[in-house]
């Protein structure tokens, strides 16, 4: 089965222990079955940029989470999107096939 995760679900997975039911569900579904749409990535990116203006320290944490977790899990590890995302991957210095995990 395939699941498309909404922005609030992806955000709920950011902090371990904050939303145990969401984390338990995500752990029960293989990462390969979890997807996000482009608008979800854009909404998260918009939130990170907004936080950069008001709280640079927190924005660093959010940026690292977005770049190291969200993009790696949902974009760079998916072979079908690699050709589209390759320029972004190179820009932020990713190895497209390194290991992934939520936390």
Curated annotation (Swiss-Prot):
Superkingdom assignment: Bacteria
DNA-binding listed as a keyword: no
Cofactors named for this entry: Mg(2+)
The enzyme's E.C. designation: 3.1.-.-
Keyword Cell inner membrane listed: no
Residues that hold Mg(2+) according to the record: 6
Domain PINc residue range list: 3-74
A molecular function GO annotation: nuclease activity
Keywords: Hydrolase, Magnesium, Metal-binding, Nuclease, Toxin-antitoxin system
InterPro entries with a match to the protein in the record: PIN-like_dom_sf (IPR029060), Type_II_TA_system_RNase (IPR050556)
Function: Toxic component of a type II toxin-antitoxin (TA) system. An RNase. The cognate antitoxin is VapB14.
Family membership: Belongs to the PINc/VapC protein family.
Protein name from the UniProt record: Ribonuclease VapC14
The species this protein was found in: Mycobacterium tuberculosis (strain CDC 1551 / Oshkosh)
Gene name of this polypeptide: vapC14
